[in-house]
């Protein structure tokens, strides 16, 4: 089984770490738009494998969705975070575009994947992914 986590920030990296540590799949792909960010996080997680006694493969990628091909599950965590004083609605249009782009890439490379959205505002981002995936 292959799981992709899109977004290597705190939520995404923690999600990838837990999935790998609990051996919920054979391979975790961590993707982020920031250059070398996902690769670094994946390497950090992978290097804990011997100590934590798991053998899940984990790899990072900078925006190369071809590495996510044939994922069984994709977790979308990538959006811009809220800054102090912002409401959850302030970033809807920006975050919707991010989720739309990510979902299009997911469908292109893993059309049968189960998509889990963990991006705020959650209800709107989930609906955006649903519409984009044309489920």
Task: Label each PLM-derived region with a short phrase.
Residues 8-9:
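Glycine-rich Rossmann-fold phosphate-binding loop(s) that bind the pyrophosphate
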Residues 12-13:
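N-terminal Rossmann-fold NAD(P) dinucleotide-binding loop
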Residues 25-29:
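Short beta-strand element of Class I
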Residues 33-70:
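Conserved N-terminal Rossmann-fold NAD(P) cofactor-binding segment
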Residues 72-75:
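N-terminal Rossmann-like NAD(P) cofactor-binding module of classical short-chain dehydrogenase/reductase
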Residues 78-80:
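Conserved NAD(P)H cofactor-binding loop of Rossmann-fold oxidoreductase domains
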Residues 87-134:
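Rossmann-like NAD(P)(H) cofactor-binding subdomain of soluble oxidoreductases
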